[in-house]
Amino acid sequence: MYGKFIKDTAGYEINTFDLPASWEYIYENKDILLKVDQYGPVYAQANPPGDIMLFKREQHQKYSPWFINITTDRNESLANFLKPYNTVIKPENVKIEYLPECAKYSFQYDGMRLETEIFLPDKGAKIVYKFKITNIGTENKKLKINPQLVPYLNDAVIAPWDKYDWYLDTKCEKGEYITFSSELLSANAESSKRRCAYFVSETKDLTAHEISLEKYIGLGDMLHPDRKYTHEERIYAYPPVYALEYEWLLSPNEEKELTQVYALDNNDVTDYFDNEHYIGKKSERKVVFDKLFSKNRIQTGDTEFDYYANYWIPMQMNWVASLDRGWPTGMRGTRDSAQDYAALLYTDTSSCKNIILTMLECQRSDGWMPRQYAATGKNGKHDLRGHVDGGAFFVELMWKYLSHTRDFEILNEETEWLDSTNKNTVSEHLIRAVEYYIRDENIGEHGLCKIREGDWLDAVNRAGIEGRGESVTVSEQMVMGLKYLADILNHINYEGDIKKYLDFSEKLKSNINKYAFNDENFYNGCFNDNGLWIFSGRDPDGEKRIYGVPNYYAVISGTAASENYKYILRAAEELKCDKGYRLFYPPLGEKPIDKVGRIASGDVPPFMGENANVYNHGSQGFLARALSVMGEGDKLFEVLKWIMPYDQTKHPTKKTLTPPYAIVNCYQQLPGFEHRGLMCFLTGSVAMAMRGVYEWMLGIKPCLDGLEISPCIPENMDNIKVQTEYLNKAYSLEIKGRKVFVNNKELTETRTDMINGKKVYFLPI
């Protein structure tokens, strides 16, 4: 519907501008992130996700701040993305191609073919924008071409009373090229933080330009400006625009092209006006993605699944690493980073080290890690709400990083603390992260970890603010986390007491099973400050309410005994619906429950966000991981296909309204929006899909001393081939029946998985 996947790449072709929603695609090179949709550029951010926005659409704004208006000799207006002008226009041969290396837009109308191409080079905060018209008719075409870009050039979020334009000094210079430059001044008199953006365009056929947005718009608006051109050369403290006018005369079969570049660095900008240079840079960019797609390859016999896993999952992992959760506020979530980068390790280990060190300098000296930390590090703005799960996720990331890289030297590096200038080693930071959870003041009356202001489920944000509430999920995470720490310390010959961590892990496991496993044979979610269990066999509102996450983590962490797996499977089946697996059920809020949080207060409608929806990350990602432990290959494969968006029998586009290439945050059941997808790419589900394929289904798990391999595959898949990399070496795996071959040699050595006790194949490396 609306288009089709492009073979052999993470590409999609769209054949109409009239999509039911904004269908987005991301371009990023670490120096800049650009989001586009069918109507062109949406926003651009330097050094994502923590730096300034170069331009952005405001909320509910449909059309791009950077587009080109075309006026014909019949005084008819249209744009290079067709709209926002005459909506009666019916273009022909619409073709929007999202390719990893560039975005292409083309259509035909009134004897013209209009083409736009948007490109980010491999390095640098630059956006190259090329627009071409070809006269495919039989008569001359006399056209006015009016490009316009409204720059923003400021932090994504500023004070409500503040204005971005107060800090901009914009100039225009005309030479071989016309160059607009906007200098961002510092509101805090820090001259070192000044920035300058450059917008460069051609001068051939140029007839007018304008830098004052106010004067350019006149009595109109941004979509229909008066287009007054005063030819002023400077404006400051008022909003700028980069507006130009060209006059083109095209004979039949003649084409004309306009190149524009928007950049934070004026070096080599004009090189992109040379098409040979541009094509070369585009080819270089394509090679980068070809290498990305070749790092891990699977061949299962399910061609649609293989295509999506081989191209779209690694592509979106790259995006997520730069988007974080897509709120361009300059912060990253601790739990979000930990989960995303644990999956990114399969394709990009170097970025993970930088993230780890940044996270640790934002760690409090008692071991606690913030809900969100500044992407720029310790001295930035942080979200210091009292959620307690960040460190639990971080410990697993640290173990996985060491397993994927063997970079044990990182443990000796030193970094400061959020609340102290003292420096300690990474290993000390890691130990304190774990010991935070086992300190007496952070253990509740049932011997479980206290929940404070929240765990993974953000909307349970008032269950423990008085200091009594406990989290079952965090306790289960620490059953694992304590073992991860012990494994690391054993590996580096740590001379301190390691046994105490393993003992406490067993103690937590015992307490969870004693107090949180209820008479209905599933695990409760949390214990609140009122002394009541929530997500239990009988909640305070009278409902039996199964919450998947603590049940799945009971299996993942090795807390649940294997004889109780049948109860976890039954609980999951009770959460299943026609959209996948719900996070919990029934919804909260009809009868408000005190001391739980916003999700149970009546302020979050049923089936909104996490509230009893198919919340992809926790509903299906954690379930997939648990199913791999339980050896449920058929169910695991089905759940992975529920996470992914391409299968029209599971997530029909006519219902979700989101693109079939985009992994979403959740599928909602709100009245009038049944099965509607919410927030493309802004989710930990992408990381769950990556790990789901390679770590949980194919069972490839790097460890501190080698590879554990424990496939969990459907019964009908009897010959799977895998190409992967580990420690910069390529490995070829074949899974035939229940046998595993590595580089054509059958793997026979086994050992016990230290977390869940399963027997697994082992390849010492």
Whereabouts are the PLM-identified features?
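C-terminal capping/lid segments that line or modulate ligand- or cofactor-binding pockets
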Residues: Y2-F5, G11, D18-P41, T329-R332, ...
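Non-catalytic C-terminal accessory modules of carbohydrate-active enzymes
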Residues: V42-F55, Q61-S106, M112-L114, G609-A612, ...
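Extended, loop-rich substrate-binding clefts of extracytoplasmic carbohydrate-active enzymes
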Residues: N75-G124, L219-L244, Y307-P314
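Polysaccharide-binding surfaces and accessory modules of carbohydrate-active proteins
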Residues: Y105, F119-R227, D274-K291, K295
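Beta-strand-rich recognition/accessory modules
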Residues: K126-K130, E202-K281, I465-R468, G481
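Catalytic cores of carbohydrate-active enzymes
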Residues: N146-Q148, K163, P370-R371, Q477-I599, ...
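Active-site acid/base region of carbohydrate-active enzymes
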Residues: T300-Y308, S350, M359-D366, F393, ...
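Aromatic-rich carbohydrate-recognition surfaces in CAZymes
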Residues: D336-S337, Y341-G447, S471-V479, M608, ...
